[in-house]
Structure formats: structure tokens, C-alpha cells
Curated annotation (Swiss-Prot):
Keywords for this protein: Porphyrin biosynthesis, Transferase
Biological process terms in GO annotation: protoporphyrinogen IX biosynthetic process
Protein name per its UniProtKB record: Porphobilinogen deaminase
UniProt entry tagged with the keyword Magnesium: no
Domain of life (superkingdom): Bacteria
SUPFAM superfamilies in the record: Periplasmic binding protein-like II, Porphobilinogen deaminase (hydroxymethylbilane synthase), C-terminal domain
Any one GO MF annotation of this record: hydroxymethylbilane synthase activity
EC identifiers of the protein: 2.5.1.61
């Protein structure tokens, strides 16, 4: 490759994005960052409606999982309508199709789940029988394990729809990703940020990923200043847990890595949807590279396998049918992402 191409600022760039309010915010966030790097570059946003945005009457894990949020964007990359696609990282399948690359992972927003309620300040304050809304199997399993006296019901729709359902009294509380609420200036709706013990975040939650065609080395170089090494190591470790376990979107699976005292600490969970069986494993690595972070993810996945995680994965994948079984490792974040992009 001609390195001179990399040093020449791009003249135009097109960002492919879902058309949801949060997705467009994220695309605009990247557009502004690129404009600061390359003031003379004309950066446009191509808004697109994905199948995942259109299906609102079913849990997405039953009709195709995470891939429903990215296929149309990848088609735009492939045919040249767009140069890059901006994703909430937990929307991105663990294995990308041939010819595509996740070139850039940006600095993470708050990865925690958030309790949104008009009447209660914590999950512990909710009375027996209170209805909590979520379409995330991960969140549902954690709620059923920690608060079996609560009633968990599905919640779909975009962010405004979900909040309106809460406000009209359909739910006593709902659980959403904190990052999406904060990015849209709705942080005041958060009554509590959930401790990982109550709701371990999904792999990649709160992080933005930029996908490009694998043959665009020039574009990868232009995007390199937006890459955040610490976030990349954390989410690569998390995604490796999901990838190694090879579960389907029907499997409540979470992985969350944090940096403390120069070391990366990773925890993973696999559960049954009813919360009756929850397996947990954790490990740490000092100042890991991305390669060591991936190995850390494999270590945690292996520890979960030794506890019987694959029994849960196989049983749930078989019960959900071959379509879900083919989806590859994934927490059920795709269902949440229809609302918040997170």
C-alpha cells in the first residue's frame, strides 16, 4: 500500500447508520470527531432502516438476532454507498462476514444498566408483584435470580415508546442501558445505576464500533486516532467470552471487563432464563495487549465451560431452533438495542 495515501486527508466520507434517534446521535458524534481531525473533509450520514428496527412484535433473538441491525449497513459498505458504519458494539455479531473489519473502537460511555422508574429509587424498593420491563434475556435472568418476587415482562419499541409505556403505568420500572440515555440527554430519567451484581453488562455495552471493508487500509489509518486502546482491550476480552462459548441469542450471557490498578479484570456469566442457574467466572491480567485480552476472555470462557455453561448453551440453542443456533455467541442485547442502540 502507498503510505502517502494514508497521510492525505480524505475529501469525502459517508457514514452508514441506523435511523433511530440514538444511532443518528452516534453517527453525528463520529462525524464531528472526523471533522475535527480533517476539517476539509465533507462527512455525510446515510440513514438506513434495518430489519431489526422494523420488527417490534417479537424478541429479536427469535427472528435473527444481532445480525438484523447490521446487514443493511454492511451492504452499503460493500456496494460503495458508504465508507464506514457506526454501531453500538453490542449490536455487532461476534464474527463478521468475510470482507469486513471492525477497525475502530471508541472510548466507552457508562456501560452499566439503568433503572428507570417514576416511583422507585432502587430495585430493592420495588414491592412484590411489581412489573419490570425488559426484552433482554440477560437482564431478565439477573432480575429473576436477585428479585424473584418481581414480575418481568417484555418491553419493545424505540426509546420514546418505552418511556411512554412506563409513564402511562404499564410498568413500575424498566431497565435500559445507561449509555443510551446519557447520550440523548435523558440522564435525569435514571433513578439508579445498577451494580454489576444486580445486572452484569453485556459484552461491548456502552462502546461504539466502526466497521469498514477489510480492504480499506487507507480508511483504517484515517480512523486510527479515534481508536481507544483501553476500551478495545476490555471489549475484546468481553466479546471473546461470548465467541468462545458459541451460544445463541437465546442464552442469557454477560461479560464485563474493567481496568483497576493497571490490570484488566473480567467477569462472565451464563444463566438460564429463569435465573435458577447462574454460572460466574472471573480472571485478571496485568496491562494486557488486545491479544492478551482475548486470551483473558478465553480463560473466563473455559472456567464457565468447566462449570457446565455448554449444557445451558446447547439446551437453549436447541430449544430455540436451528436459526438461533446459527447466530453465534451473543448476549441478547439486540433486543435492547431496538430501543436505545445500547
Amino acid at each position: 500500500m502507498n503510505t502517502e495515501t494514508f497521510s492525505t486527508p480524505p475529501h469525502t466520507l459517508v457514514i452508514a447508520s441506523r435511523e433511530s434517534r440514538l444511532a443518528m446521535w452516534q453517527a453525528e458524534h463520529v462525524r464531528c470527531a472526523l471533522h475535527k481531525l480533517y476539517p476539509s473533509c465533507d462527512v455525510k450520514i446515510l440513514g438506513m432502516t434495518t430489519r431489526g428496527d422494523q420488527i417490534l412484535d417479537r424478541t429479536l433473538s427469535k427472528v435473527g438476532g444481532k445480525g438484523l441491525f447490521v446487514k443493511e449497513l454492511e451492504a452499503a459498505l460493500a456496494d460503495g454507498r458508504a465508507d464506514l458504519a457506526v454501531h453500538s458494539l453490542k449490536d455487532v455479531p461476534m464474527e463478521l462476514p468475510a470482507g469486513f473489519a471492525l477497525s475502530t473502537i471508541m472510548e466507552r460511555e457508562d456501560p452499566r444498566d439503568a433503572l428507570v422508574s417514576n416511583d422507585y429509587d432502587s430495585l430493592a424498593a420495588l414491592p412484590a408483584g411489581a412489573v419490570v420491563g425488559t426484552s433482554s434475556l440477560r437482564r431478565e435472568a439477573m432480575l429473576r435470580m436477585r428479585y424473584p418476587h418481581l414480575e418481568v415482562r417484555p418491553l419493545r419499541g424505540n426509546l420514546d415508546t418505552r418511556l411512554s409505556k412506563l409513564d402511562r403505568g404499564d410498568y413500575a420500572a424498566i431497565i435500559l442501558a445507561a449509555a443510551g440515555l446519557k447520550r440523548l440527554g435523558l440522564g435525569e430519567r435514571i433513578r439508579a445505576l445498577l451494580d454489576p451484581e444486580d445486572s452484569l453488562p453485556a459484552a461491548g455495552q456502552g462502546a461504539l464500533g466502526i466497521e469498514i471493508r477489510a480492504d480499506r487500509a487507507d480508511l483504517a489509518a484515517w480512523l486510527a486516532p479515534l481508536h481507544h486502546d483501553h476500551t478495545a482491550a476490555a471489549v475484546e476480552a468481553e466479546r471473546m467470552v461470548s465467541r468462545a462459548l458459541g451460544g445463541s441469542c437465546e442464552v442469557p450471557l454477560a461479560a464485563y471487563a474493567t481496568w483497576r490498578d493497571g490490570a484488566l479484570h473480567l467477569r462472565g456469566i451464563v444463566a438460564t432464563p429463569d435465573g435458577q442457574r447462574v454460572l460466574s467466572a472471573q480472571a485478571s491480567a496485568p496491562a494486557p495487549s488486545v491479544e492478551r485480552a482475548v486470551a483473558l476472555g478465553q480463560e473466563v470462557a473455559s472456567a464457565l465451560e468447566q462449570q457446565g455453561a455448554m449444557d445451558i448453551v446447547r439446551a437453549l440453542s436447541a430449544a430455540s431452533g436451528p436459526a438461533a443456533a446459527k447466530q453465534g455467541a451473543a448476549e441478547d442485547g439486540a433486543a435492547d438495542s431496538a430501543a436505545t442502540g445500547e
